[in-house]
């Protein structure tokens, strides 16, 4: 399956989480994890473009700011597909300052899995708070035509 479709799913799932947190009230730990998803995506996006990240991996954003950042990221990831950098490798420093080289495809897969992992944590927090978490299963997105 191509990364572009999976990033469309990732964007949809993040927006579903935003909608749920807005409707149910965003517990601070859940919002912090959603912020981390956004911050980490900006860090990886910057690494792919050999630029400095817009924010760190644990930013403090409101739900409204998260929405705006997700919209900007959606456009940015589309630009990545247009630049056709898949199949290449990038060199970067991690948050500890250690130098690494990774395949772009591996970075993209990591970004997707990272978001899925933390959305699962958010779902647990929402459920523990007595609310129903966003239904973000990929198959649901596919069946509903979201991706």
Give the predicted meaning of each segment.
Residues 53-94:
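Helix-adjacent hinge/juxtasegments
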Residues 4-57, 96-147:
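Short, contiguous alpha-helical
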